[in-house]
């Protein structure tokens, strides 16, 4: 009001200009950090990418950028002084993270987590720090089993398919050999009846068939048993690795 009463318009204009300049300087370093806004989904053993950016966009090459998790603010990945600070990472993330910096000059970065584990599921916090000013954004990672949509009964059936496919041709071979051996044994028995006394052969026909078939099918049955054992063992190891990759 003093300016109005004294009609000192140049001094009023200069005061207003200085005020605007002071306000612009105080807000020059401020920005907002924006996350994806929705849960990021990844399969166990696969890769997950967590995007993060600042608004308004600006060159973040000289800033400190990082991700951490609660509790105890465990460092997932940290970028400072123009390079990654791997030594400050939590042990469970060492060698498994990568900061994609192709668009860091625009204020956009992405954290890539490799070989995702079930323990990686949960909340993450991304932050940008420019000197003493820092802003953060929260995001969530959901980890899913590759076979989460499959009923356990279906998994059991899938595991048994190779065994069934092997046993079908084995059964056909068994029936074929049984038919051939029966015909051959019947002819030999008839010849023996013609040559020797009928009372000489008192051994039942099924026993003769058994004595001939067992030496033929014995190794085949052993092979089937070994295959089933090996298949169950490998299937168990595969499912265990899916649940506990490390």
UniProtKB/Swiss-Prot annotation:
The keyword Repeat does not apply. GO terms for biological process: cell adhesion. Residues 178-209 are cytoplasmic. GO terms for cellular component: membrane; myelin sheath. Coiled coil: none annotated. InterPro entries: Ig-like_dom, Ig-like_dom_sf, Ig-like_fold, Ig_sub, Ig_V-set, IgSF_BTN/MOG, Myelin-oligodendrocyte_glycop. It comes from the Eukaryota. PANTHER family: BUTYROPHILIN (PTHR24100), MYELIN-OLIGODENDROCYTE GLYCOPROTEIN (PTHR24100:SF71). Minor component of the myelin sheath. May be involved in completion and/or maintenance of the myelin sheath and in cell-cell communication. Mediates homophilic cell-cell adhesion. Belongs to the immunoglobulin superfamily. BTN/MOG family. Homodimer. This is Myelin-oligodendrocyte glycoprotein. It comes from Mus musculus.
């Amino acid at each position: 009001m003093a300016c109005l009463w004294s009609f000192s318009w140049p001094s009023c204009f200069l005061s207003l200009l200085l005020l605007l300049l002071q306000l612009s300087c105080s807000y020059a370093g401020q920005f907002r950090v924006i996350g994806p806004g929705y849960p990021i989904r990844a399969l166990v053993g696969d890769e997950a990418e967590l995007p993060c950016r600042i608004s308004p966009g600006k060159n973040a090459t000289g800033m400190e950028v990082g991700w951490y998790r609660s509790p105890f603010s465990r460092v997932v990945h940290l970028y400072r002084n123009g390079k990654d600070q791997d030594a400050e990472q939590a042990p469970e993330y060492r060698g498994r993270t990568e900061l994609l910096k192709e668009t860091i000059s625009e204020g956009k970065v992405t954290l890539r987590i490799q070989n995702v584990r079930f323990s990686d599921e949960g909340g993450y916090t991304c932050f940008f720090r420019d000197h003493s000013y820092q802003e953060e954004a929260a995001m969530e990672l959901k980890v899913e089993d590759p076979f989460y949509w499959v009923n356990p009964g279906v998994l059991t059936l899938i595991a048994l398919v190779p065994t069934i496919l092997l046993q079908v041709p084995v059964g056909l071979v068994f029936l074929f050999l049984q038919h051939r051996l029966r015909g051959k044994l019947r002819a030999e028995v008839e010849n023996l009846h013609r040559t020797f006394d009928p009372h000489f052969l008192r051994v039942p026909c099924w026993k003769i068939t058994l004595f001939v078939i067992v030496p033929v099918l014995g190794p085949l049955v052993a092979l089937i048993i070994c295959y089933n054992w090996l298949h169950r063992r490998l299937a168990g190891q595969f499912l265990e690795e899916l649940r506990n990759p490390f």
